[in-house]
Design a protein with these regions (language model features):
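Small-residue-rich segments of transmembrane alpha-helices in multi-pass membrane proteins
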Residues: 50-62, 117-131, 153, 186-200, ...
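Membrane-interface junctions of multi-pass transporters
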Residues: 12, 57-114, 242-337
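Flexible hinge motifs at transmembrane-helix junctions and intramembrane kinks/re-entrant loops
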Residues: 34-49, 55, 265-280, 403-404
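Membrane-interface segments at loop-to-transmembrane junctions
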Residues: 41-44, 78, 109-121, 178-190, ...
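Short, strongly hydrophobic alpha-helical membrane anchors
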Residues: 1-17
Length: 443
């Protein structure tokens, strides 16, 4: 084949790949907005609708009802470009989550004993239940995976709380500044901090193949990275922000470039350490969480693009890995029901018990339990890490996705019932519910 022919073939391949990527992106963005709008219309979070739409675009529905069309859209081109886009979006989203993290909740003195008890019970009980479930169920539902590693990721998925979406649900019910709201958001903040640290440690442990030496080295490198980020990178970034920030709370092009470069370099650093690049994005957000003008400017200029473009890509990426049809036996659905029951009992029951122990009423304790049970996007991030590591099977992945959806869907109806009983929270009218996204600004 001549050089000209090779060049022509290369151009044709590139154009063909671009065609299918653009087709996928058009479908994902449009249907993501439709799914989100439907969810908002019925009084749910926009994130719930986008997650469900992502699953419906995968083999669970689209692939089952129209396999030829599904393969044409999603299997005609190599999956790597869409995978890379989803991971870039996830890194940016993790940066955004880090930016929005409010550490002042961790120092709130009001009802401190209740906060500590609720956070502890809401983390420890579901983690232990998830660990037991994952360990004993692994031979049946993840036979090819490392049994202990699989159990650790299931336990982490059960113990996490979706702080950003929980905060927005609380805003809809106007309870963020009430004593109950302060207790919940503070407990969820502690839960989230420990949850992300736990995920980083478990990821490092799994990648070290449970070698004490390799694991210790990864932890040492991770600690050095965190220290260098806080004591060296943060002061440098603050100087650059002071020099490059725009007028008011605007984000100049130069500062935007610096932030994006810092996010990607941080992701590269955590990858080189031996944990996933998404942790680098989160760490960079945490470094700048107190730069309020930067946070506002980022959310206004870039946050909405991440929400509208990248987030549905990640949900669809998750949906393509989810196959509800793979749960093709009563035994598998039985395991799924048990997982959902343990997840709800562990988080709701643990937080309810801790709240009652702290002297709160039954109604207050129920509201705390249902709010702390919200998982949404945070759990999807955890289980995607576990799936990429090969420590959970597709069936377990599907079960955990369903659990993430159910645990989030039941939050708003539960609050509509229990908050009025304790004289709090005007349930939002369905037609006026503000769209909310996990880790992203309302759009």
């Amino acid at each position: 084949m001549t050089t000209a022919a090779l060049a022509q073939a290369s151009v044709h391949h590139t154009e063909s790949l671009l065609f299918f990527i653009l087709l996928q992106l058009a479908l994902i963005v449009v249907l993501g907005r439709v799914g989100g709008a439907v969810a908002v219309r019925i009084g749910q979070s926009r994130a719930v609708g986008e997650i469900v739409m992502g699953i419906l675009l995968g083999p669970s529905l689209f692939g089952a009802l129209a396999p030829d069309a599904f393969h044409y859209v999603f299997r005609s081109a190599a999956p790597e470009p869409m995978t890379i886009l989803s991971q870039i979006g996830l890194i940016l989203l993790m940066f955004q989550i880090g930016l929005e993290f409010d550490f002042s909740h961790l120092t709130e003195r009001r009802n401190r004993s209740a906060v500590i008890r609720i956070a502890s019970a809401g983390l420890v009980l579901p983690f232990l239940l998830g660990l037991a479930f994952g360990y004993y169920a692994a031979p049946h539902i993840s036979p090819a995976a490392n049994r202990f590693a699989s159990a650790l990721f299931v336990a982490t998925a059960l113990s996490i709380t979706a702080l950003p979406i929980l905060g927005r649900i609380m805003m809809e019910f106007d309870i963020t500044r009430t004593p109950l709201g302060v207790i919940v958001i503070s407990a969820a903040a502690i839960n989230d901090v420990i949850g992300w640290l736990l995920l980083a440690v478990i990821t490092a442990l799994t990648l070290a193949h449970f070698s004490a030496w390799d694991f210790g080295l990864k932890l040492l490198l991770l600690a050095a990275y965190v220290a260098a980020s806080w004591w060296l990178i943060r002061p440098l970034l603050l100087r650059l922000i002071a020099r490059l920030r725009g007028s008011g709370d605007s984000l100049s092009g130069n500062l935007m470039g610096v932030l994006l470069a810092a996010i990607f370099l941080s992701g590269m650093a955590t990858y080189q350490i031996g944990i996933f690049a998404i942790f680098g994005g989160f760490m960079m957000g945490v470094l700048l969480h107190d730069q309020h003008d930067v946070v506002k400017a980022w959310k206004r200029r870039i946050g909405e693009f991440v929400t509208v473009f990248f987030l549905p890509i990640f949900f669809t990426y998750t949906g393509l890995r989810t196959n509800v049809g793979g749960l093709d036996s009563l035994a598998l659905w039985g395991w799924c029901a048990l997982l959902l029951a343990l997840a709800t009992f562990g988080k709701f029951g643990g937080c309810y018990w801790a709240a009652r122990w702290s002297g709160l009423s039954r109604g207050e304790s129920k509201a705390i339990g249902i709010m702390m049970n919200t998982r949404a996007l945070m759990e999807l991030i955890v289980i995607n890490v576990g799936y990429d590591l090969g420590v959970i099977s597709q069936n377990v992945f599907t079960m955990l996705v369903l659990m993430a959806i159910v645990s989030t869907v039941i939050t708003t109806p539960g609050l509509r019932v229990w908050l009025p009983q304790i004289g709090l929270g005007t349930p939002p009218r369905r037609s006026r519910v503000k769209p909310a996204l996990d880790g992203a600004p309302p759009v």
